[in-house]
Amino acid sequence: VNYDENALANLKLSGSDAKKENIKEVYMDLTNVGGPNKVLMDLNLLKDNSLSQSIGINDNVVAGEKEIPVTIVDKNGENHKALGNLTVKSKVGVGPLDFGFDESRIYFTVTDRFFNGDKNNDDPHGNNYDKKNPYTYHGGDLKGLTDKIPYLKELGINTIWITPIVENTDFNQMFSQGKTQYSYHGYWAKDFEKLDPHLGTMYDLKTLIDTAHDSGIKIMVDVVLNHAGYGMKNKEANSGANNYPTEEDRAKFKGMFRENPGNDFITQESAGLPDFKTEDPEVREKLIEWQTGWIERSKTEKGNTIDYFRVDTVKHVDNTTWKVFKNKLTEINPSFKTIGEYFGADINNDGGQLQNGQMDALLDFGYKGKAREFVNGNIEGASAYLDDRASKISNTNLMGQFLSSHDEDGFLKTVGDDLGKQMLAASLQITDKGIPVIYYGEELGMSGWNGFEQGDQN
């Protein structure tokens, strides 16, 4: 493997004692590939005496044969040693898509709000949306993204992150309250194997991928494994709304949801959305099958497909699921990368997600605050933090810096609509170590407040 790929470490245990109950822990020493000296392997994945986990290669590692020491600690505390081998190759790239994941320049767009390329798919279920309302569908689609590839190429973007593409529920989620709210954002899934009709057709998706790749731009798709949409677990107060999910719609998720939600991050129903029992191996495998299936499903006649996933609600799903998910992605394509939304993460708080077979990168929630400090005059303090941040970032310990997002107040609003401060912060963002993530419209000085009643989603 080269430094922009993941390898799958496979450990085969032998002997009658090679059972989970007889093992205290198993860990790898990844020092020889630029990783930590103790990376635990997840014993929940022990199956048929085998254990697998994805590993990354630091780009400072010299090409050649590398040894991976493995230690198995039995229930009595005794250590048993093993040794794995890995060949690290030099990365040779000649094409416009041969940049490393850590060289990405991401443009994040809420697809429905970007550009309407096909008005025929604006209202597939006859809901008669009021497009002046910020909580309904406005018509942006995949064809609209394709039409604007030249603009994004000129801007210098090499990766487009688009909101989830799976079919979402399409009913007024606030019908019973006399208000309006639809899942234009894509995070309330109805069917994980179908493309949402508001976005267009599979032909449109494949055309976007081919057109982007022809322009040296990769496609990152947002995926959710934590929850489905409202109305997909049981009938709710809004069941009188047009196009409310049917029993047939709900049947595909039978037995997959948590019946007795808890109060912790893993077991709670975030925002009241039906929570998947991802710690159940059957539920986990089904969700991973649905999401990774899009890599083959979206493959074009040219052989192009989705390049990366942005992973939603990482904090709300068990770590074993993320290891299985990453293992599957590595099997499909060693170069397929993920950037996770672990809410509140920064360079000093990755929630245990990086360098252990789970996420390849995390969105950096702490960055915008330090950028704001810098542009407001605390140059020395902010610079010290950013220098320390840069010293800790590598291609295997990677953060994506953003100033604004669909979940938080726009940066420009938080600095009093001062465009000079916005531009200075953007200069920091694009040149700092890590992956710059530009929120759509931000390059034009567009911004808004977060919050349901403020109406600045566009």
Q: What is each PLM-predicted segment?
A:
Residues 26, 213, 217, 289-292, ...:
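Active-site-proximal helices and loops of the catalytic beta/alpha 8
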Residues 80-86:
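Edge beta-strands of extracellular beta-sandwich domains
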Residues 100, 104, 114-303, 322-333, ...:
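Substrate-binding/active-site clefts of carbohydrate-active enzymes
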Residues 46-54:
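Aromatic sugar-binding surface patches on proteins
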Residues 72-74:
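Conserved structural position at the C-terminal beta-strand
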Residues 57-64:
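Surface-exposed, short loops/turns at beta-strand junctions within beta-sandwich domains
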Residues 1-7:
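Short, solvent-exposed loop/linker segments at the N-terminal edge
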Residues 16-30:
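Solvent-exposed loop/turn segments flanking beta-strands in beta-repeat/beta-sandwich domains
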